[in-house]
């Protein structure tokens, strides 16, 4: 009977070790995907702010030239 208990414990232990390793790899992959998503979001925000700054500068120049032309 003791032999069966030891065998069962060994089987359970050997099943839990790979399961633990798989969970760790899964967490690492999820972290990498999250990091990639964050990087893409930062790139999009940087591009959008660059476009808005350029548009604001052009609009400011246009308004400035219109007001100088009226004087």
From Swiss-Prot:
GO terms for cellular component: extracellular region; membrane; other organism cell membrane. Expressed by the skin glands. Keywords: Amidation, Amphibian defense peptide, Cleavage on pair of basic residues, Cytolysis, Hemolysis, Membrane, Secreted, Signal, Target cell membrane, Target membrane. It is found in: Secreted; Target cell membrane. Residues 1-22 form the signal peptide. The modification Asparagine amide is found at residue 68. Pfam families: FSAP_sig_propep. Residues 23-45, 70-71 form a propeptide. The keyword Metal-binding does not apply. One of its GO terms (biological process) is defense response. Residues 26-40 have a biased composition (Acidic residues). It comes from the Eukaryota. Residues 25-46 are annotated as: Disordered. Its main location: secreted. Neutral peptide with no antimicrobial activity. May act in synergy with cationic peptides by enhancing their activity. Has a moderate hemolytic activity. Belongs to the frog skin active peptide (FSAP) family. Plasticin subfamily. Plasticins have huge conformational plasticity. They can display random coil, alpha-helical, beta-sheet or beta-harpin structures. This is Plasticin-C2. It comes from Agalychnis callidryas (Red-eyed tree frog). The lineage of its organism: Eukaryota, Metazoa, Chordata, Craniata, Vertebrata.
